[in-house]
């Protein structure tokens, strides 16, 4: 594929069928953002296996299940704690997009539909071999199996090793091999497979030999200090699941070390929910600083709807808020639009921003020259 989004892989093995992931494309709207699920809607499916709970991997799941109500949905136990919250939030977002942008396809599914399919969801521990051929009628042979391996990307993320009678396949999903602030790196050392499907956003870019995560975090903390010193506010656009918690952990450790003052940090409502789950499930995850409880270490305040457009930005505030790519009608987009042009403030990117998104436009902009941030804000 030329870009990321709408991840979905249909696998036929030993007379059985497995769908791995069912995402939506972040740059396409309505049904155009879905995988080509209509191609297989009349074909029997044994199971669906999920790598992790980001929308580009699970956002189309209810639509996939609509034609395959007998298929069980397999995921890690940590993803099991997240999946319903992610999908219910997706309904809320789609309903708002229908109202604000007139996208008639939205919502692609409803809250009631999610409640109906929730009993299909099953969570498993890492490194456990799981039979998945629930439809026994096609073959008397033993069921193929799958096993989840920690991918180190976000809470609950996994690579999926599928074993058949003669062949094995490994699908990584999104993977992070280096330890982050909280999560340890991927644990793929024991994987042996005949076929590898590997997703990577930056696979053709080598990591500079001088790169150091510790040095980058130190630069970020120092930049935050300098911004607050000049009475500006700090915006760190993040995704609610994963990057938000990693950045909050870095801020908590910097505060504990005396590098930052203890002060309110503004996050989104969904970010708060996922942060609570990170805290509650710390003992189940393969993570560093397992005793670090983010809600106890930081003074987290949920930014209410519409507050980003009106609250005062002077005096030094820290926002760790969605959306990571500053999509329109999000708090990060609205805050950035207000901060740009005021040299006191600082906007710091800590992850990928697609070049065609407002975040990508801002990253590519040249200081002092006009640029189009988004259609709603203009230059």
PLM feature segments, named:
Residues 1-43, 123-184, 310-312, 318, ...:
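Core dinuclear metal-dependent hydrolase active-site scaffold
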Residues 6, 10-71, 75-117, 121, ...:
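Pre-active-site segment of Zn-dependent metallo-hydrolases
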Residues 20-22, 45-54, 61, 73-76, ...:
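Active-site neighborhood of phospho(di)ester-bond hydrolases with catalytic His/Asp-centered motifs
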Residues 152-157, 166-194, 199-201, 205-209, ...:
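Active-site-proximal loop/helix segments of hydrolase catalytic cores
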Residues 200-217, 236, 379:
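Glycine-rich phosphate-binding "P-loop"
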